[in-house]
Amino acid sequence: MSAEIKKTGVKKVVLAYSGGLDTSAIIPWLKETYDDCEIVAFCADVGQGEAELEGLHEKAIASGASECYIVDLKEELVADYIYPTIATGAIYEGTYLLGTSMARPIIAKAQVEVARKVGADAVCHGCTGKGNDQVRFEGCFAALAPDLKVIAPWREWEMVSREDLLDYLAERNIETTASATKIYSRDANAWHISHEGGELEDPWNEPTKGVWTMTVAPEDAPDKPEYVTIDIEQGKITKVNGELLSPYAALMVLNEIAGAHGVGRIDITENRLVGMKSRGCYETPGGTVMFAALRAIEELVLDKSSREWREQVGAQMAHLVYDGRWFTPLCESLLGASQPLANLVNGEVVIKLYKGQAQAVQKRSPNSLYSEEFATFGEDDVYNQKDAEGFIRLYSLASRIRALNSKS
């Protein structure tokens, strides 16, 4: 690149930086590609773990960044993005609890805030041209800062493999802990961790034990079940085993407890936003328990029509979050519309954890519509079974008329 004419028009860029191979190569690439351009690294702490953050500032500076901002977003992620999303019942394609998708808007928002703080005229990400994340990040940038230029090196540079990136860094004497033998592509945050690539790209290959990092194998989990009590107020988890906890703290406690019982593993082939299918193995131990607890209370407090409507909202919300459309009027509308039902979701649930399963075995709510008197098969004074006759006749009226018309 040094022999080529450098691009102009970008004086300061904020890079979403992880310290991994891709973003380590992006810093020198930006300096070589853009004339007199200052690189500011930005890292979002979304609960990926201390090991991922250790030495990150020093590594960014050594790679050529002028500064590295590490922003703690853990509490905000869980309280303002995860909790509202799961309150709608959002599950992508029936199984995926949207771990990566929910984290992208808050990361993009914080990146824009850093860009404004330092006076940058561009933002940069390390997403590949085949994945969903490029759309998610750039969709958020468009909504929050349409004036900022977006740089996506994977759609520009000529490097196509890990080996290319390693050679690029070696030529510039930039140290990296990455190797050409890396097996899996992983993305972690407080809610989950995803595993892709390697032998997982063949859907005929069963994931080995080495794939999973947050959960034990269900067959190796304790032979004795563990019971966890969860308190819920207005669709939000407030207590775990009687202890009042912040959203992030509650998730961390449940991650540890549920992970020890092998809870929260899924292996799916999903439809990506960009049109192709991809296989992903996901671990969401605490989130799986939270979801089970919320659904248990919903079963008690939501009438049939409300529950059907909530499922419709959840399905639409899942696609919206997966597709990276958080900062839109539709997202605001869905979250606002789901809140009246979430306000009814109050109660206490006991979840049984055993060999990879999380089952609600006890539940109660002050808003419960369930009545043992009405539901009993014994004699009662509150329900006259003869009343059902007229209801059934009216309920089946259309079928009756259709049958009579067909005979005539």
UniProtKB/Swiss-Prot annotation:
The keyword Kinase does not apply. GO terms for biological process: argininosuccinate metabolic process; L-arginine biosynthetic process; urea cycle. It is an enzyme of class 6 (ligase). It comes from Shewanella woodyi (strain ATCC 51908 / MS32). InterPro entries: Arginosuc_syn_C (IPR048268), Arginosuc_syn_N (IPR048267), Arginosuc_synth (IPR001518), Arginosuc_synth_CS (IPR018223), Arginosuc_synth_type_1_subfam (IPR023434), AS_cat/multimer_dom_body (IPR024074), Rossmann-like_a/b/a_fold (IPR014729). L-aspartate binds at T128, N132, D133. PROSITE patterns: ARGININOSUCCIN_SYN_1, ARGININOSUCCIN_SYN_2. The lineage of its organism: Bacteria, Pseudomonadati, Pseudomonadota, Gammaproteobacteria, Alteromonadales. It catalyses: L-citrulline + L-aspartate + ATP = 2-(N(omega)-L-arginino)succinate + AMP + diphosphate + H(+). This is Argininosuccinate synthase. The gene is argG. Keywords: Amino-acid biosynthesis, Arginine biosynthesis, ATP-binding, Cytoplasm, Ligase, Nucleotide-binding. CDD domains: ASS. Its EC number is 6.3.4.5. Pathway: Amino-acid biosynthesis; L-arginine biosynthesis; L-arginine from L-ornithine and carbamoyl phosphate: step 2/3.
